[in-house]
From Swiss-Prot:
Coiled coil ranges: none
Pathway annotation: Amino-acid biosynthesis; L-lysine biosynthesis via DAP pathway; LL-2,6-diaminopimelate from (S)-tetrahydrodipicolinate (succinylase route): step 3/3
Cofactor: Zn(2+); Co(2+)
Catalytic activity from the UniProt record: N-succinyl-(2S,6S)-2,6-diaminopimelate + H2O = (2S,6S)-2,6-diaminopimelate + succinate
Cofactor binding, note field: Binds 2 Zn(2+) or Co(2+) ions per subunit.
Highest taxon in the source lineage: Bacteria
GO molecular function, one term: cobalt ion binding
Biological-process GO terms, alphabetical: diaminopimelate biosynthetic process; L-arginine biosynthetic process; lysine biosynthetic process via diaminopimelate
Family: Belongs to the peptidase M20A family. DapE subfamily.
Protein's gene: dapE
General function of this protein: Catalyzes the hydrolysis of N-succinyl-L,L-diaminopimelic acid (SDAP), forming succinate and LL-2,6-diaminopimelate (DAP), an intermediate involved in the bacterial biosynthesis of lysine and meso-diaminopimelic acid, an essential component of bacterial cell walls.
Binding positions (Zn(2+) 2): D107, E142, H368
Record EC number: 3.5.1.18
Protein name (record): Succinyl-diaminopimelate desuccinylase
Length: 395
């Protein structure tokens, strides 16, 4: 029996599966085959929810006496766009000059391929693991993230599963392998403000009520002053206005409604609830401030709706997990990785409610891009890091 010790072969098998969210595309089947060669038991639960596609997931475990390490990630990928723009077909796993091309090469089929290879090498060298390893893999990370990791964790918990630590194999390194380990993530909160006015002719503003004035005033209250100046482990919270729309194509008509959407990435100064309260307070003050209403006699009439479920800020403090991974990275790459909380959200935001979690994978320079690719040397390097980590974690 040949174990899946080669990360290049593993990744090629996964890339050749066109698993664009929500399609499984054969990727979980390919992964399950690799894991069963190593004695893992596997389950493939499918989760559903209103107004979202059904999603197939995978949970596989190889049990032993000792701590339980979870590797988490996703096999779904974003669409490749126009395939004619690619140097090589996005699902061909073509190799040229020591580089493999393909959608998901770094985000994040590459990380999965390397961890599989690392486990296989450990088993080949040492026999059974002194503990348990599980793979918690979803097909719903790049999509709504409703029928994926969040439900798979609860499904596993209900069946008696618990974990001592987790690694998420997202591409964490900005420039080179070994740059960065993610030990936490900022929270994320999104909302939409709608201001109602009275439609009218632009030449007769006294007969209308322009909602654009109101939306500008309210948005400005969220941009200034800054929410905070950052903390010891997190950069300053940052709000970005992502859309402003009046739905009006005529230049001589005052619209009757204006909307603005925003997203704020926030640090551990705030909880989602305290930040929502701060935003509401700012909007209320601005809506009622005579100095800001530009002659309006009544407060600005607006509605605030929260979009999506907020992601909560978190920071991992587990010294064994962080220290062991840091030492493994340094031993293989020769450099000490930065411990960071930068970047966007990931499924680690769900895992942190079950066990300590960190993120470490390949470099992210080409993720979601045309010609997404990974150096074969990086696949070998990451496999060696994971293999060393597994050996040291289980001692």
């Amino acid at each position: 029996m040949t174990l899946p010790v080669n990360p290049v072969d593993n990744l090629a098998a996964l890339i050749r599966c066109p698993s664009v969210t929500p399609a499984e595309g054969g990727a979980l089947t390919a992964l399950e085959k690799m894991l069963k060669l190593m004695g893992f038991s596997a389950n493939r639960p499918v989760f559903s929810d209103d107004n979202t596609p059904d999603i197939e997931n995978l949970y596989a475990r190889k049990s032993g006496n000792g701590p339980h390490l979870m590797f988490a990630g996703h096999t779904d990928v974003v669409p490749p766009g126009d395939e004619k723009d690619w140097k090589h077909p996005p699902f061909a796993a073509a190799i040229e000059d020591g580089v493999m091309y393909g959608r998901g090469a770094v985000d994040m089929k590459g990380g999965i391929a390397c961890f599989v290879a690392a486990v296989a090498r450990h088993i080949e060298k040492h026999g059974n693991i002194k503990g348990s390893i599980s793979f918690l893999i979803t097909g719903d990370e790049e999509g709504p993230a409703v029928n994926g990791t969040v439900k798979l964790l609860e499904w596993a918990k209900q069946r008696g599963e618990s974990w001592d630590a987790s690694i998420v194999g997202e591409p964490t390194n900005p420039n080179a392998l070994g740059d960065m380990i993610k030990i936490g993530r900022r929270g994320s909160l999104s909302g939409t403000i709608t201001v109602h006015g009275v439609q009218g002719h632009a030449a007769y503003p006294h007969l209308a009520e322009n909602p654009v004035r109101g939306i500008v005033t309210l948005v400005d209250s969220l941009l200034y002053p800054a929410f905070d100046e950052g903390t010891a482990n997190f950069q300053a919270s940052n709000l970005e206005v992502t859309t402003i729309d009046v739905g009006n194509k005529a230049t001589n008509v005052i619209p009757n409604k204006a909307t603005a959407s925003f997203n704020i990435r926030f640090n551990d100064t705030w909880t989602a609830e305290s930040l929502q309260a701060e935003i509401i307070s700012r909007l209320e003050r601005a809506a009622r401030d005579n100095r800001l209403r530009q002659g309006r006699e009544t407060p600005i009439k607006y509605e605030l709706t929260w979009r999506e479920r907020p992601s909560h800020v978190f920071l991992t403090h587990d010294e064994k997990l962080i220290g062991t991974l840091t030492a493994s990275v340094e031993a293989v790459t020769g450099k000490r990785p930065e411990l960071s909380t930068s970047g966007g959200t990931s499924d680690a935001r769900f895992i942190k409610d079950y066990c300590p979690v960190v993120e470490f994978g390949l470099t992210g320079q080409t993720m979601h891009m045309v010609d997404e690719r990974v150096a074969l040397a990086d696949l070998e390097g990451l496999t060696q890091i994971y293999e060393r980590f597994i050996a040291d974690f289980f001692g």
